[in-house]
Amino acid sequence: MPYERKKGLKEIFLGTKEASPNSENPEYPYGDYFVQFGGEDLDAFTDRIYGAVREIAREDTGETILIVTHGMAMRRFLRAVGYRQDGTGFIGNCGIVQLQYEEDTFEVRKIINPAGTAQNINILGKFCGKRDVERLTSEQLQKKYGIAQADIMVLFGGSILAGGDILAEAIKEKIAKRYVIVGGVGHTTETLRQKVQNEYSQIRTENLSEAEVFSRYISEVYGCQADFLEKDSTNCGNNITYLLELLKENNLACESIILCQDATMQNRMDAGMKKYAPDIKIINFASYRAEVVQKEGKLSYIRPIHGMWDMDRYVQLLMGEIPRLTDDENGYGPKGKDFIAHVEIPEEVKKAFSELKEVYGEKTREADPHYASK
């Protein structure tokens, strides 16, 4: 039977010359865009699919685009989108491709509009990347907390290099009385080592802890140093407990503390400190603020951030946080593993996370048992 167009949806038709819009065969859809399969190499075919998606994404305010394929184009299409056994694949960064069947001839695939995906990533980014002051200055601290200096400032080694830049600036501006870098070896350590080594070849990072890498970084680049290094912690939980032990062992007074962690993990670090040291005034200042936008049908950062994760890794880290922060039997809160204090998840964040799961599937970072607390 003839193919029926889906009302209100844009369509891209992938087909052979025989199934082109010029064909007289009424069973083939013409679509809003036609990408012809003609035996060219996979990269060229893939680029043409991306181009059609980008064109529709620029003009379409709806949430879905249908890709209709036929004949030999199907196999090329599956390879182009990196099709997986769970029925998903990707058109660049435009979103998930979900399999649907139409009779025996056509396979229809749904793509989530990248503009909505960018917005949802930003919602998660803002929620996870807490900043309690707009800028880390004495004036801001005085205005909000009535203090010119915090007792302690901590940089956690899970951060990207931007965290080192913030710490160095804070040291020069005397934002705190004492400075600590916390971090042994964890799931982000090797990435940090490689970033520093690639950008600053004179800084040797092999086998160093995160605290040692950042210490060498701020010394070499900014000529400053932290007062203390904590080099044994391996995860967000013992980042906090080992830090508190260090403060106690060195008789460091701590009524107020600035926490600076990677933006993806800042909220969890705050919740961890609230569990183990509820009487300390916590000042959150995530190491960066990332804003994601749709650009030419792809997701990109609106401005460069020093040492920033690639987009795929950033999304994976963000999506891994929401199940951890959710206070249920599977989360890290009191109702679950009891690693952190209760965190309230706003409905807007829950909705954004749910929609991102439609785009990326279960793209969350699983906890690595190698870095669990002993």
Describe each PLM feature range.
Residues M1-K7, E102-A118, W309-P323:
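Conserved histidine-centered catalytic loops in small-molecule metabolism enzymes
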Residues M1-Y30, I171, R178, H187-T189:
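Phosphate-coordination/substrate-recognition cap region in phosphate-metabolizing enzymes
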Residues P2-K6, Q85-C94, K177-I181, D279-A286:
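Short hydrophobic/aromatic-enriched beta-strand-loop microsegments
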Residues P26-A44, L229:
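Short glycine/proline- and acidic residue-enriched helix-loop micro-motifs
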Residues D60-T69, I258-C260:
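Beta-strand elements within well-structured catalytic alpha/beta cores of enzymes
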Residues R84-R109:
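Domain-level recognition of soluble alpha/beta enzyme cores
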Residues A118-M308, A367-K374:
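A structural signal for short, hydrophobic/glycine-enriched beta-strand patches
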Residues V293-K357:
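A conserved mid-domain beta-alpha-beta active-site/ligand-binding segment of alpha/beta enzyme cores
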